[in-house]
A protein has these predicted regions:
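A short LG(V/I)-centered, amphipathic sequence patch enriched
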Residues: 40-57
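Central regulatory/effector-binding core of bacterial HTH transcription factors
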Residues: 90-153, 215, 220-223
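Secondary-structure junction motif
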Residues: 147, 190-212, 273-281
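Hydrophobic hinge/microswitch elements
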Residues: 128-141, 147, 200-252
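Acidic, Gly/Pro-rich loop/turn segments at junctions of secondary structure
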Residues: 116, 127-190, 242-248, 258-259
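A late-sequence structural motif
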Residues: 253-288
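Alpha-helical linker/hinge and terminal dimerization helices associated
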Residues: 42-43, 64-86
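Short helix-boundary/capping micro-motifs
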Residues: 10-28
Length: 288
């Protein structure tokens, strides 16, 4: 049922004139007449009696007025609600984040976000990048803040937010810390603590360093904080983002090696985001 036809019917009923109804709706009289005729055809009944220059509602027309007024009122209320949702940021926001972003990038963002949008209830889940993609496709979470892959699945899209430069590091008293420059061959002679296989960060490391398959891997972990703690205690060397390298670690100089990863937002390309999710994206955008 066409809402414009209902509006035309109610205006003709109110003014008892096709010409006056046309003026009020900024239409031509033939356009008003066509809308009424279309409505009558769809209902298979006559709504107005044409009595010369005068018109009069039929019994069917009179019966329809309360229903059509209620329909228009409900439509206007629905539009008001949608407009309010667009202007007011509230509700429930469920999203995922990697442990690294959740610990090192997200806290100042959330501090600003919760101050601006205190009515939003946050549900933050820590997860791997691969798990986040599956949950977004399933619709379980709206978005995720993760290490962005070079290639993404169909129906997903990404928004880069941060660039993480990564370096090989050792403890201050590690034998490699005494070297001005270190080669890949020298790295391969020492035990290493690496990110877990099949993670995007591990793929970047493997492509950049092309390590000997026989290298001694002391430990693999998804948690960079765990890897950092092990390196600090002299268990081996590893790769960490610049933001995690402090005075307890020594950065190794390796000629020709550059490692970068991109952190940002992963979301469903076809999903309409809530006002709270859009507000988070805006906060992230303004954070850089």
């Amino acid at each position: 049922m066409d809402i414009q036809n209902i509006r035309a019917f109610l205006m003709v009923a109110e003014t008892q004139s096709f010409s006056r109804a046309a003026e009020k709706l900024f239409l031509t009289q033939p356009a008003i007449s066509k809308r009424i005729a279309t409505l009558e055809d769809s209902l298979d009944c006559q709504l107005f009696d044409r009595l010369g220059k005068n018109i009069q509602l039929t019994q069917a027309g009179q019966a329809l007025i309360p229903s059509y007024q209620r329909i228009l009122s409900e439509i206007n209320e629905t539009r008001r609600i949608i407009s309010t949702l667009r202007s007011e940021v509230s509700g429930h926001l469920k999203f995922g984040t990697s442990h690294h972003i959740g610990l090192h990038r997200l806290p100042p963002i959330l501090k600003k976000y919760t101050k601006l949008y205190h009515q939003v209830e946050l549900d933050i889940q820590f997860m791997d990048s691969e798990q986040a993609a599956a949950l977004i496709l399933k619709g379980s979470i709206e978005l995720a803040l993760i290490t962005l892959p070079d290639e993404i699945e169909n129906h997903l899209s990404t928004i880069p937010v941060w660039t993480d430069t990564m370096f090989c590091v050792v403890a201050k008293d590690h034998v490699l810390a005494k070297q001005k420059y270190v080669t890949i061959k020298q790295l391969s002679e020492h035990g290493v603590l690496l990110q877990a296989q099949s993670t995007h960060t591990r793929d970047i490391i493997d492509q950049a360093l092309k390590l000997n398959p026989e290298i001694k891997i002391i430990m693999e972990s998804n948690y960079l904080e765990t890897i950092k703690a092990m390196i600090q205690n002299g268990l081996g060397w590893g790769v960490l983002p610049e933001s995690m390298i402090d005075g307890s670690l020594h950065r190794l100089n390796i000629k020709g090696v550059k490692m970068e990863r991109h952190l940002g937002v992963l979301l469903h390309a076809s999903r309409t985001l809530s006002s709270s999710a859009n507000a988070l994206l805006e906060t992230l955008k303004n954070s850089n």
